[in-house]
Amino acid sequence: MMNLVLQYGLYILILVVLAIPLGNYIGKIMNGEKVFLSKILTPCENFIYKMLHIDKDEDMSWKKYSFSVLAFSIISLIVLFLIHIFQGFLPLNPEKVSGTSWDLAFNNAVSFVTNTNWQGYSGESSLSYFTQMMGLTVQNFVSAAVGISVLFALIRGFIRVKQKGIGNFWMDITRTVLYILIPLSIVVSLALVSQGVVQNFKQYETVSLLEPITLEDGTVVTEEVVPLGPAASQIAIKQLGTNGGGFMGTNSAHPIENPTVLSNLFEMISLLLIPVALCFTFGRNIKDRRQGIAIFIAMGIMLVVAMGIIGVNEQMGTPQMALNGQVDLSTINQAGGNMEGKEARFGIATSSTWATFTTAASNGSVNSMHDSYTPIGGMIPMLLMQLGEVVFGGVGCGLYGMIGFAILAVFMAGLMVGRTPEYLGKKIEPFEMKMAVLVCLATPIAILIGSGIASILPETVNSLNNSGAHGFSEVLYAYTSAGGNNGSAFAGFAANTPFINISIGLSMLFARFVPMMGTLAIAGSMVKKKKVAESVGTLPTHNAMFIGLLIFVVLLIGALSFFPALALGPIAEFFQMLG
């Protein structure tokens, strides 16, 4: 148990130490200030603007900014869909992989354009190097940049006074990719290659096993095919951009994607680095660092509590394991805990931490099988996604989602004291409240409607590997992952079917773009308003009371929306295990 506590403390410490300077750096990028990379990258930036005829002086209204986001995303979706369909005719396909089905192409295109990276396939057997590089990796960069750009627009809405424009989308996305995502990805890629993660264009290699394996049917296996490819470059941005889609089917549990404890540390820190840094960017750029720290603390408290619950439940295992003597918490030499579905080289503490990080952020990469966790250990990752991916969340979208909850919190506080609510010096009026509700409720709507329909269809029910409460949890987790733009899975049922591909694709689109449009509408409304001077009745939004209120509002909406569904799934399974 002490190992658990020490690892948790180390991960959080490293994150904060790296995130604070990165947050300041990102703040400079948002404002167009010079940074240490400016001499190298400014000529590249200006060349891109010139080549694409981008007007650097244009300041977009929220409607034009929204139109640009949607137009860019639609074009990205169409291009990625066509790459999947025609990959058999495209270069860099040494394994001669044919094109995917239209429904899988639609699902995967939506998945990567929305920064979800839900995968109903194994990358090493279904996709060519070209599709992985020019399709998925490109979207890993730009979908992350879209989320950060929308956050930039929202911050400008609060800091600008009596204006109409919230920034230039084309400049925001260009600067985000060029100055933030590419430099960080180069560093992480090189670190991963140093640990043995593959980065090449070779054909898959067939190697002889050290020891033959005899299968159940008597077949003796003496060789194994080792998948290769440009993995390190994709893995770096899949973590940094909170994308999560694995180069291999088993994601970061695969020894080629994540071979060592050190590579695991690099990938895990990369996972939450930018979402944590953006909290400090927020405080810096609104010129009140206390606001960013308050949101960071609120998110951090929920993250640490979730880490503790998952870690303890996995270390304690199930009642059945305790009866068999597999778990003994009374001695310093921990006997095991629930190691099912976990890599022996990582163990319970590291696997539990990753499960917390990946579902707190809208990442979805895994280094263990969440379906094999204990009922409560598996419920907490599900709940983190159901809260709206606001416990740090995805790059950009996590913070603007939490700001939506902050608006709800100050509105509730305003009702209690009979004052017009204010946030960051701007009045919160009916329009902002409507948009904030839209931002906060889009995820529950997408999850509950999708999982409800899927759970009553014979096609889905008949494909479940597990019946009862756990089978329902597998379906609920799938649509929770889609609605939370996460991408991880319990698996356990046939996911690559036309209905699942289309329904999950629609859930991902709804949960991505409805909150995004609501956020931009809030930015467009706020940017026109004047600042209101603080008074005795103004609710401070940087103290302990507000942090507690914000956590309460997030948990209240999550609990009210999902408790009935969780009661039918993981909670019911927990009580079944108690016997």
From Swiss-Prot:
Residue spans crossing the bilayer: 2-22, 66-86, 135-155, 177-197, 262-282, 292-312, 391-411, 437-457, 490-510, 546-566
Keywords, sorted A to Z: Cell membrane, Ion transport, Membrane, Potassium, Potassium transport, Transmembrane, Transmembrane helix, Transport
Superkingdom of origin organism: Bacteria
GO cellular component, one term: plasma membrane
Membrane topology, from the record: Multi-pass membrane protein
InterPro entries: KdpA
Gene Ontology molecular function terms on file: P-type potassium transmembrane transporter activity; potassium ion binding
Residues making up the signal peptide according to the UniProt record: none
Locations listed in the record: Cell membrane
The keyword Cell membrane is annotated on this UniProt entry: yes
Main location: membrane
Sequence similarity: Belongs to the KdpA family.
Quaternary data: The system is composed of three essential subunits: KdpA, KdpB and KdpC.
Protein purpose: Part of the high-affinity ATP-driven potassium transport (or Kdp) system, which catalyzes the hydrolysis of ATP coupled with the electrogenic transport of potassium into the cytoplasm. This subunit binds the extracellular potassium ions and delivers the ions to the membrane domain of KdpB through an intramembrane tunnel.
Name used for this protein in its record: Potassium-transporting ATPase potassium-binding subunit
